[in-house]
């Protein structure tokens, strides 16, 4: 985010890619304008929250008219840096890592896994879905060559912190952590933790204690 752009709440920032994906779909279908109520129904975020999120960026729409789809598309493409390619490294090419390589964020035009790393000699030197797999000992050199500053971590939890330490040392600025380990990194490095077992347990708890959901979607 540049100095000229507003600093928005983190919760709002996490919803922006969701809005952008739906707006892309609207644009592809030929729709020219959309109301906050229509957006709310599609993305399962209440209208008041959508209007508040959009208000951080100024007047994106007009009362009684809604939002111009083309304008929103252009605005969010610029805000989310969709014209700037982000190269991503995958560290840990096990079952989950292999799934990421095969998927490779096909719906995201600006995000691609360009290299994978693993300690398994049977995987090193192979190519999976067009992504070359290298030994973890080669991370520093290859990451610098490819100007990578984002990594997905899917290694065994016992190795997560030491691998994260290496990633930080190699200049990584963002880590998407799929291991159960809670990583310690400098303030200059952003980590998002995604623990699938915790998410599943949380889902089951909410099913049991909040069965009607009341319009709340996580």
Curated annotation (Swiss-Prot):
NAD(+) binds at residues 92-97. Belongs to the transcriptional regulatory Rex family. InterPro entries: CoA-bd, NAD(P)-bd_dom_sf, Rex_DNA-bd_C_dom, Tscrpt_rep_Rex, WH-like_DNA-bd_sf, WH_DNA-bd_sf. It comes from Exiguobacterium sp. (strain ATCC BAA-1283 / AT1b). It is found in: Cytoplasm. Modulates transcription in response to changes in cellular NADH/NAD(+) redox state. GO terms for cellular component: cytoplasm. It holds the Pfam family CoA_binding. Its main location: cytoplasm. Coiled coil: none annotated. PANTHER family: REDOX-SENSING TRANSCRIPTIONAL REPRESSOR REX, REDOX-SENSING TRANSCRIPTIONAL REPRESSOR REX 1. GO terms for biological process: negative regulation of DNA-templated transcription; response to redox state. This is Redox-sensing transcriptional repressor Rex. It comes from the Bacteria. Keywords: Cytoplasm, DNA-binding, NAD, Repressor, Transcription, Transcription regulation. Residues 18-57 bind DNA. Homodimer. GO terms for molecular function: DNA binding; DNA-binding transcription factor activity.
């Amino acid at each position: 985010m540049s100095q000229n752009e507003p600093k928005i709440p983190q919760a709002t920032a996490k919803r922006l890619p969701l809005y952008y994906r739906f707006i892309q779909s609207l644009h592809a279908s030929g729709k020219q304008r959309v109301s906050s109520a229509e957006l709310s129904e599609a993305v399962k975020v209440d209208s008041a929250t959508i209007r508040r999120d959009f208000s951080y960026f100024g007047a994106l729409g007009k009362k009684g008219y809604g939002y111009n789809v083309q304008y929103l598309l252009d605005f969010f493409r610029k805000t989310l840096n969709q014209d700037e390619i982000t190269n991503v490294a995958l560290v840990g090419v096990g079952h989950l890592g292999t799934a990421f390589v095969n998927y490779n964020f096909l719906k995201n035009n600006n995000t691609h896994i360009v290299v994978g790393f693993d300690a398994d000699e049977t995987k090193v030197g192979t190519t999976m879905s067009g992504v070359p797999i290298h030994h973890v000992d080669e991370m520093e050199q290859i990451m610098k060559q490819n100007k990578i500053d984002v990594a997905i971590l899917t290694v065994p939890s016992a190795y997560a912190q030491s691998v994260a330490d290496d990633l930080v040392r190699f200049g990584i600025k963002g880590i998407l952590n799929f291991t159960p380990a809670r990583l310690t990194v400098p303030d200059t490095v952003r980590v998002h933790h995604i623990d699938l077992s915790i998410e599943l347990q949380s889902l089951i708890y909410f099913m049991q204690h909040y069965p009607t959901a009341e319009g709340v979607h996580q």
